[in-house]
């Protein structure tokens, strides 16, 4: 804002950002000992629900490499800016290392009802969500290494790949929010990193990078 106030030219897509699912209880500032392990990127192998107990996106739309940078923003749109990634015991071995750090926001329970109570969601609604999801899964082979088309039918949002029933206790829920890595908007610069005015002339002594 200080640069804009002295006449710097804005540039880029200011309403967009690189946004990931980030541990809800992570600190406000980074920890070099943990680095990026507060991210939570194994969501394709479970379901994602908001505080109302409702799914709100296709967890298996594509490999996480192609969805993780935009799904954080979808969490940001949810009530209280929080969501829960839910897994059961049979997918536990598929979770990335970041799910095992001591600081992780994790809740476990032996039933969906108990899990819901522990994370502050209506047990009735979460049980209904999980039941509808489980009953909608097409009976095809599961393969985590490819787009296996093991999908749901008849529910919205769908899950396009890696749809396994959530039916094997214990169940785990990981609280996530949106972590913004960087925005897509900034200041226009030239090849020497000088910040430009609206007429494309450089502002003396003002440089930008990053």
Regions found by a protein language model. Give the residues of each.
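Residues forming the flavin
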Residues: 1-148, 152-210
């Amino acid at each position: 804002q200080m640069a804009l106030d002295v006449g710097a030219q804005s540039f880029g897509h200011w309403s967009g950002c690189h946004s990931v699912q980030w541990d809800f209880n992570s600190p406000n500032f980074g920890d070099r000992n943990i680095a990026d392990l507060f991210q939570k990127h194994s969501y394709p192998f479970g379901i994602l629900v908001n505080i109302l107990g409702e799914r709100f996106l296709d967890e298996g739309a594509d490999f996480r490499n192609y969805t993780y940078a935009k799904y954080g923003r979808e969490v940001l749109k949810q009530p209280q800016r929080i969501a829960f990634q839910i897994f059961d015991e049979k997918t536990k071995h598929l979770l990335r290392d970041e799910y095992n750090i001591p600081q992780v926001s994790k809740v476990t329970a032996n039933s969906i009802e108990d899990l819901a109570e522990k994370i502050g969601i209506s047990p009735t609604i979460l049980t209904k969500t999980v039941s509808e999801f489980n009953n909608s899964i097409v009976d095809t082979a599961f393969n985590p290494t490819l787009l296996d088309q093991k999908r749901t039918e008849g529910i919205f949002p769908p899950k396009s790949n890696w749809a396994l029933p959530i039916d094997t206790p214990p169940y785990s829920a990981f609280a996530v929010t949106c972590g913004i890595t960087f925005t897509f908007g900034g200041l226009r610069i030239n090849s020497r990193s000088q910040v430009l005015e609206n007429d494309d002339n450089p502002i003396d002594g003002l440089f930008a990078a990053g």
